[in-house]
Regions:
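Intrinsically disordered, low-complexity terminal regions enriched in Ser/Thr/Pro/Gly
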Residues: 1-162
C-alpha cells in the first residue's frame, strides 16, 4: 500500500508543480528531421533559402486536459508570424491560410498525458531578402486560455544565380 500512496503523492506534487509553473513552450527547435517526442535532428544552423520550407519541433508543457467520461481531451491552437530584423511583421499568406487542422490540435487520449509535441512544415516566401528573421510561434492552451510564445531565429541566405 505504501507504493500506491507514494505514487499518488508524486502525481499530486507533479500536478501542483505544473499549475505553479503554468503553461509554457518548453522547446521550439529548427530541425532537419522529427521522428517522435524529443527524438529529432536539430538543424546545423539557422540558415534557410528564400522559398524554402522550415521544419519546427514545438513542445508545450503544463497544458490542461478536459475530462470527458474515461477520456482526456487536449486542445491546443497554433499561430506563426514572421518578423524581419527591424521587428516588422511580414505577411506569409501560406501561414495565414493554413487549415484549421494545421492550426489546432484537439486530441482525445485514454489517460492524462503530460508529454506532447507538434511539428510544423512552414513554407517561406520566395521573395525574402537575405538577412536575419524571427519566426514567432504562439501556442494557446484552449482549456486554460493561457498562451506562450517563442521566437526562433532564422537567417535567409542569398539565392544562387545560375
Amino acid at each position: 500500500g505504501d507504493h500506491k500512496e507514494a505514487g499518488k503523492l508524486l502525481a499530486l506534487f507533479n500536478d501542483e508543480d505544473r499549475l505553479a509553473t503554468g503553461f509554457v513552450i518548453e522547446r521550439a527547435q529548427l530541425c532537419t528531421a522529427i521522428r517522435r517526442f524529443r527524438d529529432y535532428t536539430p538543424a546545423e544552423g539557422d540558415r534557410v533559402k528564400p522559398g524554402g520550407v522550415i521544419l519546427l519541433y514545438v513542445e508545450p508543457r503544463n497544458f490542461g486536459l478536459q475530462r470527458n467520461q474515461d477520456k482526456h481531451i487536449l486542445h491546443l491552437k497554433y499561430e506563426w508570424k514572421l518578423y524581419d530584423d527591424r521587428s516588422t511583421e511580414l505577411q506569409v499568406p501560406a501561414w495565414e491560410q493554413a487549415s484549421l487542422e494545421e492550426r489546432e490540435d484537439r486530441l482525445s487520449v485514454n489517460g492524462p498525458v503530460t508529454e506532447f509535441y507538434q511539428s510544423f512544415k512552414l513554407p517561406l516566401p520566395a521573395n525574402l531578402a537575405m538577412g536575419h528573421y524571427r519566426v514567432k510561434v504562439t501556442v494557446t492552451d484552449a482549456h486554460s486560455g493561457k498562451t506562450d510564445r517563442v521566437h526562433v531565429p532564422i537567417y535567409v541566405t542569398a539565392v544562387e544565380k545560375r
